[in-house]
């Protein structure tokens, strides 16, 4: 727990107005367990609109985090607000476990329409990416009558027990304290920039893809082909926006078909237009068996979904998809509105266009600052890999200093990645061009200050990060 004295010391290192924020920060540390998250800055959200947020002290920020890629349509979008208000006036919710409810059925129609696959599909719901991952695991096991699940090192799938067990980014020693479920197996993800095989995946993507596929097939055979599902983020998000070779994803799908394994496409972060496609998997020309969606689906309201082949979804017996508030009417109404906003405002196309622009701008910075080792992304899901100059060695502390200075200058942009050294860029898909440009300007100023040693090491003690 950070002491009162430590927070009193913060005035030595920042001139930012944060007195009202600190009141809540101290209460948070008193009442909320530390396991509830990483707190990057001593700021408390007071209100938000579009691509901007304001804290308790009235400081205004451009939001490049969007609550961890939740607000694809921007904060408090009028269309989403209207849908929520209209549904609340009718009724909050009634359990789908016993009666029929219209909004989740209408939402299912839309999800079936916008997901890949020209076959009959069905949809089940939850409240977070974590529980949706759990539901996808249930479906894979019920359908195949097998038990083992293969996922990837440095993946992030959530914190319910099934999702936690599938997640590969956590410190194994810490994870072991919670006794994760058995029958989960992790293999290496083909990271083109930094992998254990020493392969430059940008220069030789085929070699990287084949090395990873060989490891997966060995694992399948080691498990006597008793594998129910392989769960994959088409682009690893919290690992630092890691994009595998296209042929890897295509050949992985072929491998699952060969062995009768369910291909689970985890789109919690990459879905809903974030990568310049409705779903990240569409960059690879692959049709999954199951798609997991959450985060941006509800436009800020908590809802998740698993969309999958009808025969797989119907293999799960009653009542194993039931939650009391499954398909919550208010949240489902928000999700319907969110999908309609993305369609009407052409945000998928906008994400692709702005993403290309951002990659160009950030790669121009890379030419100036050798501490930028790699810039990668699709659409408006972008990672900037901060390294020790002249190497590929991650520089986590420097990345955190850049993030801190950006906050001081009015930009919310945290760090993440398997080494904690990647700048996370995921603004709303409808962010105004001027906000995008101002954000890049702040990033450059913050990098310059960090490189020139203008950000003291002491700020790191106020920043809890990946």
Swiss-Prot record:
Q: Could you say how this protein's activity is regulated?
A: Inhibited by hydroxylamine.
Q: Which cofactor does it need?
A: pyridoxal 5'-phosphate
The record's pH note reads: Optimum pH is 6.5-7.5.
* UniProt keyword list: Isomerase, Pyridoxal phosphate
Write the Enzyme Commission number(s) for this entry. Answer: 5.1.1.10
| List of residues binding pyridoxal 5'-phosphate | 129-130, 269, 324
Q: What does this protein do?
A: Amino-acid racemase able to utilize a broad range of substrates. Can use Met, Leu, Phe, Ala, Ser, Ile, Val, Trp, Tyr and Thr. Is mostly active with Phe, Leu, Met and Tyr, followed by Ile, Thr and Trp. Has weaker activity with Val, Ser and Ala. Shows no activity toward Pro, Asp, Glu, Arg, His, Gln and Asn.
Q: Give the protein's recorded name.
A: Broad substrate specificity amino-acid racemase
């Amino acid at each position: 727990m950070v002491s009162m004295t430590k927070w009193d010391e913060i005035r030595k290192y920042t001139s930012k107005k944060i007195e009202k924020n600190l009141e809540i920060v101290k209460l948070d540390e008193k009442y909320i367990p530390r396991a509830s998250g990483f707190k990057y800055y001593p700021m408390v959200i007071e209100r938000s609109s579009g691509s901007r947020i304001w804290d308790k002290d009235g400081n205004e920020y451009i939001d490049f985090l969007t609550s961890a890629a939740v607000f694809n349509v921007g904060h408090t979008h009028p269309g989403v607000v209207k849908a929520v208000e209209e549904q609340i006036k009718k009724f909050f919710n009634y359990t789908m476990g016993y009666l029929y409810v219209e909004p989740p059925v209408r939402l299912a129609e839309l999800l079936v329409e916008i997901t890949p696959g020209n076959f009959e599909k069905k949809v089940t719901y939850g409240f977070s990416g974590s529980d949706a991952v759990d539901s996808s695991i249930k479906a894979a096991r019920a359908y195949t009558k097998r038990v083992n699940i293969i996922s990837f090192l440095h993946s992030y799938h959530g914190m319910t027990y099934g999702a936690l067990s599938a997640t590969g980014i956590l410190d194994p020693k810490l994870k072991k304290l919670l006794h994760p479920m058995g029958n989960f197996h992790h293999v290496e993800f083909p990271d083109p920039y930094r992998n254990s095989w020493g392969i430059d995946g940008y220069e030789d993507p085929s070699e990287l893809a084949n090395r990873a596929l060989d490891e997966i097939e060995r694992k399948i055979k080691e498990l006597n082909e008793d594998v129910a599902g392989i769960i994959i983020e088409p682009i690893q998000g919290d690992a630092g926006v890691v994009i595998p070779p296209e042929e890897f994803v295509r050949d992985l799908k072929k491998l699952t078909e060969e062995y009768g394994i369910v291909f689970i496409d985890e789109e919690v972060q990459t879905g809903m237009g974030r990568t310049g496609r409705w779903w990240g998997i569409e960059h690879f020309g692959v049709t999954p068996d199951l798609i997991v969606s959450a985060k941006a689906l509800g436009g800020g309201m908590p809802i998740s979904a698993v969309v999958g082949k009808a025969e797989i979804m119907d293999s799960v017996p009653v009542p194993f998809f039931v939650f009391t508030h499954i398909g919550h009417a208010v949240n489902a109404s928000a999700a319907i509105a969110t999908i309609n906003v993305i369609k009407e405002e052409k945000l998928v196309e906008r994400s692709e266009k702005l993403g290309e622009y951002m990659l160009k701008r950030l790669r121009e910075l890379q030419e100036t600052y050798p501490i930028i080792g790699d810039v990668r992304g699709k659409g408006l899901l972008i990672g900037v890999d901060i390294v020790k100059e002249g190497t590929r060695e991650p520089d986590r502390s420097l990345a955190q200093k850049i993030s801190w200075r950006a906050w001081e200058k009015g930009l919310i942009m945290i760090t993440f990645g398997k080494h904690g050294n990647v700048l996370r860029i995921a603004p709303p898909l409808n962010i105004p061009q001027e906000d995008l440009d101002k954000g890049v300007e702040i990033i450059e100023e913050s990098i310059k200050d960090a490189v020139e040693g203008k950000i003291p090491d002491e700020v790191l003690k106020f920043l809890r990060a990946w």
